[in-house]
Each structure stands twice: as structure tokens, then as C-alpha cells.
């Protein structure tokens, strides 16, 4: 879709504007994508390692976090390709397939993150507001089914992004991540944008607002001394998910709406073009940074993180000492279906 925010500009009249944003774009994207790649890879890799090593402590929350970490890792593995593209000043070196895959991976991760966070918020709301129904609704099996449905839905509905192929510019350089070049493609992208805006952002955002409002009212009415750990996990989830929506998802979707309509304007003043292009660079980088928010969701709202690390250390020590007939005691299952 609108990756770099460079509208089609006549080479003779507006070349100065195009060149100035190229320098800004290449520096910002290459720097921020590099940082997001490193932080996202190690953060999500560590979360996935802890969750897999302690998989015997199954919970619905763990199922969602595993899927969220996998989606993030798949995305950050393609970010180095973007870094190389902008380091080489907007010249694509990796063929048409990887160009399509890189664009596709970013949007699959973006909307998988939104839907996984929404599902986690909904089931945490059910666990707190409707504790009786929680027993039958918030289960590992249902969490797995929800995750499968989310993956299938996002993979299929994001398939139009696979159409974002490479092309040659007037200097015969191979380009990738560029906006549509003709009006027919722009109209198609605008329709695709509004579908993804309502289904992939507005509806999930309204859902989490309703869920968090119900959670807050329930916590305020209940005794402060009861379920202190559950209260902390709920507050942690509210803070992290709300921050992800406000910092990563909302600015990007608002700016993308404005930008796509801007591309349809016949007259574009130079200063407006520069401001629009720079805003695309900032908001798209913020959207990609959701890979760094997701590990925080586990650290601050997953609960029992230290206990899981302690379990891993016990397994490591027991495997090194070779003491027979001494087994590491495992946490009991099923005491709290929404303990994570």
C-alpha cells in the first residue's frame, strides 16, 4: 500500500521536493527499522522461548501470546530487507517475490497484532466481569480455535497486499514499497483501505474500549483486597494495549486515510507534499514498532513471569546435576483458568 508516501510527481517541476524527502526517508526508515528489528527479534524471541519451555503451564493467555510472538518474529525477519532498501537509497535488490512478501508480512503482523490483542482483551473482560461464564468460555481449546480463525482471516484478507510488486523508475532503478502509480490503482487502494480501516481498526478499537470500560467498572466495584494479582494483570493489559493502539495503530490509520485522499488531489503544493511524505515515514515506523509493544504485554500483564523463569532455571539445574529420583515439582494445572 502507501509505504513511502511519495506521490507521483512530474520530474521537471517537483524534483526538488522528491529529493529532499528521499534523504529524510532513507535515514529515518533505515535507522528505525534496524532498531525495531533488533528489539523485536530479541524481545519476542525471549518471550517465545519462555512460553515454549514452560508449555506444561498451559493457559488461554499463553496461547494468544505464542501466536502474537510468532507473528512479530515473522515480520521482524523481513525488516532487514527494508533496511537494505533504504540504505541503498531506494533501490531494491532482492527480486519481485521478496518485495511482495515484505509488504505482505508487515500488514499481516499489523492486523494479527490488532486482532490478537482484541481477543485477549475480550476474554480477559469475560474472566473478570462474568466469572461464571469464564469457566466454559476462556479455555485453551477455544483460544486455539480463535487464533486459527484470526490467522486464516488475516492471511486471506491481506492477500491484496501481495499485488505490491516492483517496478522500474525513470532511472531504471528497481523500486519497492511505493504508492500506486495510476488513478485506477489509487481507487482500488482507497477501497481496500476503508475495508481494512473499519474491520481491522475501528471495530477492534471500539471492542477494547467497551471491554476495558466494563473491566474498570467491575474492578472499582469489587473489594481492593480480592484478586490482587488478577487486578494487576488487567491493569497491565489495559495500559499496554491502549498504548499500542494510541502510539502504533491509530496514528498510522488516521494518516493513511488523509494520505490516500491527498494522492487524489490534482494540485499539490510542494510544502504540503513534504509534510505529507514525512508524516507517512513517521506513522509507518510507529506502526511497525508494534512488534516492540507485544513483549511488554506479556511482561506486564501475563502474570507469573518470574515463576516461569524459575521453572526454566530448575529444569536447567536438574539436567546439569543428574541427581536420580529427584523431580522438579511442576505447578498444578487448572486452578485458575485465566491465571495468565
Swiss-Prot record:
Gene Ontology BP term (one): inflammatory response to antigenic stimulus
Cysteine pairs bridged by disulfides in the record: 99-176
Residues bearing attached sugar chains per UniProt: 14, 172, 265
Topology Extracellular: residue spans: 1-31, 82-109, 166-196, 255-279
Pfam family, one: 7tm_1
Topology Cytoplasmic: residue spans: 53-60, 131-144, 218-233, 301-340
Transmembrane segments: 32-52, 61-81, 110-130, 145-165, 197-217, 234-254, 280-300
MF terms (GO), sorted A to Z: leukotriene receptor activity
Highest taxon, organism lineage: Eukaryota
Subcellular location: Cell membrane
Claim: Transmembrane is one of the keywords in the record: yes
Gene Ontology CC: one annotated term: plasma membrane
Main location: membrane
Topology term for the membrane: Multi-pass membrane protein
InterPro entries named among the record's database cross-references: CLT1_recept, Cyst_leuk_rcpt, GPCR_Rhodpsn, GPCR_Rhodpsn_7TM
Keywords annotated in UniProt: Cell membrane, Disulfide bond, G-protein coupled receptor, Glycoprotein, Membrane, Receptor, Transducer, Transmembrane, Transmembrane helix
Transport keyword on record: no
Function of the protein: Receptor for cysteinyl leukotrienes mediating bronchoconstriction of individuals with and without asthma. Stimulation by LTD4 results in the contraction and proliferation of smooth muscle, edema, eosinophil migration and damage to the mucus layer in the lung. This response is mediated via a G-protein that activates a phosphatidylinositol-calcium second messenger system.
Family matches, as PANTHER family: CYSTEINYL LEUKOTRIENE RECEPTOR 1, PURINOCEPTOR-RELATED G-PROTEIN COUPLED RECEPTOR
Similarity-based family: Belongs to the G-protein coupled receptor 1 family.
UniProt protein name: Cysteinyl leukotriene receptor 1
Organism: Cavia porcellus (Guinea pig)
Amino acid at each position: 500500500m502507501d509505504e513511502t508516501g511519495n506521490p507521483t510527481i512530474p520530474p521537471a517541476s517537483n524534483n526538488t521536493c522528491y529529493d529532499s524527502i528521499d534523504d529524510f526517508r532513507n535515514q529515518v526508515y533505515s535507522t528505525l527499522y534496524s532498531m525495531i528489528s533488533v528489539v523485536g527479534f530479541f524481545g519476542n524471541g525471549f518471550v517465545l522461548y519462555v512460553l515454549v519451555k514452560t508449555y506444561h503451564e498451559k493457559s488461554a493467555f499463553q496461547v494468544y501470546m505464542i501466536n502474537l510472538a510468532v507473528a512479530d518474529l515473522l515480520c521482524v525477519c523481513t525488516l532487514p530487507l527494508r533496511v537494505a532498501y533504504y540504505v541503498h537509497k531506494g533501490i531494491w535488490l532482492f527480486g519481485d517475490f521478496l518485495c511482495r512478501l515484505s509488504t505482505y508480512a508487515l500488514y499481516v503482523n499489523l492486523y494479527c497484532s490488532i486482532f490478537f490483542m482484541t481477543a485477549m482483551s475480550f476474554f480477559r473482560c469475560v474472566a473478570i466481569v462474568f466469572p461464571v461464564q469464564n469457566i466454559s468460555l476462556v479455555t485453551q481449546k477455544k483460544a486455539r480455535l480463535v487464533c486459527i480463525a484470526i490467522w486464516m482471516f488475516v492471511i486471506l484478507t491481506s492477500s491484496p497486499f501481495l499485488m505490491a510488486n516492483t517496478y522500474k523508475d525513470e532511472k531504471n532503478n528497481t523500486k519497492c514499497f511505493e504508492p500506486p502509480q495510476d488513478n485506477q490503482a489509487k481507487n482500488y487502494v482507497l477501497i481496500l483501505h476503508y475495508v481494512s480501516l473499519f474491520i481491522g481498526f475501528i471495530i477492534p478499537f471500539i471492542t477494547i474500549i467497551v471491554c476495558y470500560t466494563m473491566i474498570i467498572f467491575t474492578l472499582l466495584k469489587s473489594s481492593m483486597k480480592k484478586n490482587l494479582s488478577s487486578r494487576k494483570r488487567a491493569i497491565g493489559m489495559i495500559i499496554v494495549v491502549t498504548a499500542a493502539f494510541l502510539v502504533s495503530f491509530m496514528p498510522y490509520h488516521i494518516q493513511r486515510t488523509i494520505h490516500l485522499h491527498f494522492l487524489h488531489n490534482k494540485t499539490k503544493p510542494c510544502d504540503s507534499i513534504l509534510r505529507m511524505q514525512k508524516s507517512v515515514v513517521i506513522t509507518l515506523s510507529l506502526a511497525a514498532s508494534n512488534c516492540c509493544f507485544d513483549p511488554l504485554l506479556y511482561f506486564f500483564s501475563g502474570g507469573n513471569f518470574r515463576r516461569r523463569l524459575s521453572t526454566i532455571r530448575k529444569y536447567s539445574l536438574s539436567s546439569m546435576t543428574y541427581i536420580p529420583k529427584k523431580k522438579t515439582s511442576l505447578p498444578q494445572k487448572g486452578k485458575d483458568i485465566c491465571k495468565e
